[in-house]
């Protein structure tokens, strides 16, 4: 009889524990996604970000904190190129491609952000990277007036923002791109001459 009572008590305790666990699970809510505070983020934190999503979120929060109240993130895979869109101090819409890489950024970033300008009715485009750019990327950006913000620019923007010197941070962000004025015509002419020489030689 005593054994039966002990068994029943143990069974009740196990059942009660199971019910409590189930009810607790139902009442628990998923934790809210951590909101990035740009004032606390350093370049080292950015380097530790596992993918570009965190970097885009950081830049978005940074832009809002700098006073770009209309800044918004685009819709991932259906964004037609840019990660962010904002209006600068002159009232000009900018599209932004964010690249958090451990290696230099290539041509693709410039091609993507530049080709998205018409869709977003933007007059300016830029790429912001935690690294540097390849020479080919810099050349293409120069021909298309795409502003390339490298790691050093990003660090300056972060530092000025943390010091409360928002205007200086904005000056860097909104600075004009490096423009390549060399005409492509000369290169085309040279190429055509070479083709013509080969064609004449065959005759």
Named regions from a protein language model:
Residues 1-80, 85-203:
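Mixed-charge (Asp/Glu-Lys/Arg
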């Amino acid at each position: 009889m005593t054994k039966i009572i002990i068994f029943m008590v143990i069974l009740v305790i196990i059942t009660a524990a199971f019910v409590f666990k189930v009810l607790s699970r139902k009442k628990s809510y998923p934790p809210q996604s951590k909101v990035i505070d740009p004032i606390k983020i350093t370049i080292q934190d950015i380097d530790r970000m596992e993918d570009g999503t965190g970097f885009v979120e950081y830049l978005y929060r940074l832009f809002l904190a700098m006073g770009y109240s209309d800044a918004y993130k685009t819709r991932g895979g259906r964004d037609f190129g840019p990660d962010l869109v904002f209006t600068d101090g002159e009232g000009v819409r900018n599209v932004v491609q964010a690249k958090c890489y451990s290696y230099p950024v290539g041509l693709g970033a410039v091609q993507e952000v530049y080709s998205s300008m018409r869709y977003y009715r933007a007059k300016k485009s830029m790429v912001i990277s935690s690294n540097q750019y390849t020479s080919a990327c810099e050349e293409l950006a120069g021909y298309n007036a795409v502003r390339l913000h490298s790691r050093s620019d990003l660090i300056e923007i972060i530092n000025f923002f943390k010091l409360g010197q928002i205007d200086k941070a904005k000056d860097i962000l909104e600075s004009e791109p490096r423009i390549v004025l060399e005409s492509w015509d000369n290169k085309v002419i040279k190429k055509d001459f070479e083709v013509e020489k080969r064609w004449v030689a065959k005759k």
